[in-house]
Amino acid sequence: MDPSDFKALQANPSALSFEKAAFASLYEQNGSSFEIPCGIKLFGGSARYLNKKSYALKFKKEYGAGKLNYQVFSNRDYSSYDSLVLRSGSQDYEHALIRDVLMTGLLDGQTSVLVQAYKPVVLYINGNYYGVYNLRERIDDSFISNRQNVSKDTTNIIKIDREVRSGSIKSYDELLNYLETHNMALQENYDYIKTIVNVQDIADFWIAETWATNNDIVNTRYYQNAYFDNNRWHAIMFDMDYAMYNVGHNYFAFSTDPEGMTEHGYSTTILRNLLKNKEFRALYLERIGYQL
């Protein structure tokens, strides 16, 4: 890419929509490769301000190709992408580097909880070495479409801080309101929730988060799609760079605190209220045994 464009990109971490034209190439050990024009922008939240930055590659018609058509990940059965992410390791890049891919890799394919595929790569930008990165899927409506083989047009993706990543927050707010205003100890209320939430998926997600003692909880994401699983809510595991730091932390108390998680008070409404139900508690304990 133009060196001045890259310099401007690096110097403006607070410019969330700042995107520049680039050309991406991947060369694999088996000799296969792709080369494609794309857009590049900084990726992440606070990690945008770190020395080793993460990047999103955007495949758009304005750059010459509307999609990347290439089998990037051997454990995925699709080969069309609107975007990919080059993750630096974020807060873990000066430590283990592998926390995020380790945790999501342990869960991948073992439960219905979605995680990003990854491929370790060595990154060069304009011929300069930038270190070891993880090439990953980008979590958006196209990711849900690829993973669940459904149209992306009716996808809602909501972060635990209420940021809408795709679609609308309306049905998510309705879910939280129902949980807060109806006693989940009553079986008829829990039976209704089972029609709009995949409770095993939610249990598996929070069990994994508890095992990993992931304190950077803001990137918790829930999703639903009208064409998948009767539009029930599911979870996505993402951003585990802070996993396995504070292993003595009482994470169960943390994730069920009525005041919310961290100083920001991120909602514990879903898990906390589900645990009021005897059937869900039995499922939760059963899934702990399965996952361990």
Locations of the language-model features?
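A conserved alpha-helical element in kinase catalytic cores
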Residues: 92-112
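Regulatory N- and C-terminal appendages and interdomain linkers associated
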Residues: 1-46
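ATP-dependent phospho-/nucleotidyl transfer catalytic cores
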Residues: 70-91, 95, 128-130, 134-214, ...
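Solvent-exposed, polar/charged alpha-helical surfaces in well-ordered, non-transmembrane soluble domains
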Residues: 101-105, 173, 177, 282, ...
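Active-site acidic catalytic loop and adjacent metal/ATP-binding pocket
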Residues: 57, 197-252
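Short, well-structured beta-strand/strand-turn elements
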Residues: 109-123
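C-terminal catalytic region of ATP-dependent kinase domains
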Residues: 229-292
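Loop/turn elements at helix/coil->beta-strand transitions in domains of secreted/extracellular proteins
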Residues: 81-82, 112-116, 128, 185, ...
